[in-house]
């Protein structure tokens, strides 16, 4: 009833903790879990046992990995707790009343009942004769609880009590035996018997299974051995009390840990063969001495080693070198729980053997207490004592194991049945309450008509209907019994084989026991094993040395081959370097040659570029020259037309004055009338009279052939009066095109002429604009003679007649420019020509053109000379009162008369005679007109040839 009282608060706390948000579904889940876990666990165990059968030795490991295990032994449960490292004061009672040890899972109830039925059914018919000699286990429980109150006192429990409590506690620890043993101190159960050798004597199958499981722990134990074995402490057997004695004195002064026992493999009194094994762990060492595997607790060695009557211990002084560590059995300190939960079948194989050993172990401890109390007793004495007791213990073990088994099975079965009935009743009642609550909830929800809540309620009802308590699947003992039947039969066979083997071993020990077996110790076996291992290592090292030598020889050969190859490669590299050097020299020579050629090519390119630039400049100069010549041709044509008109007027005047009236008055009046008519009708009146034009031609022609033009000095720039400006501005549309062309090309002409003067040494032109000139128009006449370079161009452009016409035009043009300069007909221009050009120009003229020009001039002069002298004064008056105003010898400059050294002087006029004027006939007039027409034709031809030349360029 204490157990039920303890578990109810735990259930309430668990329900409250899980129902923080929604209590009803959580409560349903908890009820379902509590009701279904036993059946689930039982079905899983049954399925696993039927499928696995008799497997090799695997041990069930449980505990904190799958939840706390609930094990029953009379009234109280035993709870396991993992202690990773042992301390001297870390003893705790197994049967603690704290709330932390009250946590159980219903799933393990099935395991406990399963083991109880197995043990009860197997031993019910064979060992009933000894049941009346056993006492009930409840007084042992009261003793156990009483010992907790007297924890600081030393107790010596009788041997019978030790046996009974040991067997009963062993039966309590069956479900999670292996994991609990591996997590607790090994000092609680150190005995003189070895379970491994005991299994070997009675059952080869169990021994094989156990050995296979032990072999799996070897790798895990190796690491812990090297880290945790105390240096200098020999492996000695320390025989602690049984499990009941540990519980009776949990906090005694010797400081042993009294948690759940760890079953160690120890030495049998009469082993059949040599089996040296050592199992070590962080705080325990299992040393094999001869045929023994004995355990030691390092906590006992660390403390003062105070022993009580119930705790016999021995510490023989043995050499640490005599302890062979050939094998390690991993059954201590948390190794097995890492392997997980193993199968039940392997556990069931070892259960009966454990139970049969514990009784004999308890007696062995009591009988050998005097022997092991002395810490200085040697190991051979301990072996001899074990051998003397061998026969007696072998006889007792079969009877004692079955008595303890049956007593424990009865106690556990009674408690389990009562508890299970209570649990089933409680679960059924809770299920009914849940169904009622669901019905009420469904009625409330039906009013709201919420489909989702109704669906959830139907699902909850379906889940509750599936519960084992509702469906009637609570009783599974029959199924478990059927599933365990083959295991029971196998267990009976193993028991029979175990008895036979024990009998055979006892006989062999009696007959074949050598006389000197007592003198054999662990040192001999350790030395032999060490010798064998060293021999094996020596052989392996020799083999490895031979292999290394062979490899070394091969490597030496490879090195020699590599040296030869390196020599070959070095020679090849030298040859390559030499060839590369030669190629480099050749390439350098070629590169220098190419550089020289490139430099020459660059020089040629630069020279060609310079020539191209000069040619372009010459082309520009030629273009400017052609434009200037075109302008001069236009101007000459205008002058020719003006001359024709003036000559026609003169001839008409002469024809009118044939009546020989007073020449001065008539001539003057007629000339004034003609001039007035010309101003009214002609938009471009003549600039000069025929006399001035002929005078200019004669003067220019004679001056050009007689002396160079450089003798002409710079003259004063005379400001023209208003009449001259009017004449210049009123030249009309006849020469407006020429003016536009000259104005547009004036800057280029100046720059081109300046360049040509600097390059060729030809004439230089300087334009001086008058400060007082109101007309801003710049008029540049073509006032230069033909250079040497232009005569071949004229020859290329036109045939011989064109050359003659061009020469005539140029010569007359030069005369016009000079006379215009003297008479101030145009904007003052300072002209200077070199002597070379002045002398070379007549030489380039053709003879035919000179003859024609001179003949034409002579004819004109003769015609003019025939005019009577009486016309001298009227002509001068006409020239002075004419529209140009600048034909007179004196010009009005700011009210002052400035004398000009022009050609028109009184000396020239005095040469003319009046009689010569009268001899001017109509035949001469016709010749003059024909000459002017030929001049016009030549001018037109020259202009056409110049235009074609420009188009060709």
Curated annotation (Swiss-Prot):
Pfam families: CCDC14
Superkingdom of source: Eukaryota
Compositional bias per record (Basic residues), positions renumbered to this chain: 1-21, 145-154
GO CC terms of this entry: centriolar satellite; centrosome; ciliary basal body; cilium; cytoplasm; microtubule cytoskeleton
Entry-annotated residues carrying Phosphoserine: 124, 670, 754, 798
Keywords attached to this entry: Coiled coil, Cytoplasm, Cytoskeleton, Phosphoprotein
Basic and acidic residues composition bias: residue spans: 169-187
Subcellular location: Cytoplasm, Cytoskeleton, Microtubule organizing center, Centrosome, Centriolar satellite
The keyword Cytoplasm is assigned to this record: yes
InterPro entries, per database record: CCDC14 (IPR029343)
Principal location class: cytoplasm
Region (Disordered): 1-22, 52-72, 126-189, 268-287
Coiled coil (residue ranges): 383-413, 483-618
UniProt record, GO biological process: protein localization to centrosome; substantia nigra development
Keyword Metal-binding in annotation: no
Polar residues biased stretches: 277-287
Family annotation (PANTHER family): COILED-COIL DOMAIN-CONTAINING PROTEIN 14 (PTHR22367:SF2)
Function recorded in the entry: Negatively regulates centriole duplication. Negatively regulates CEP63 and CDK2 centrosomal localization.
Subunit structure, as described in the record: Interacts with CEP63.
Protein name: Coiled-coil domain-containing protein 14
Source organism: Homo sapiens (Human)
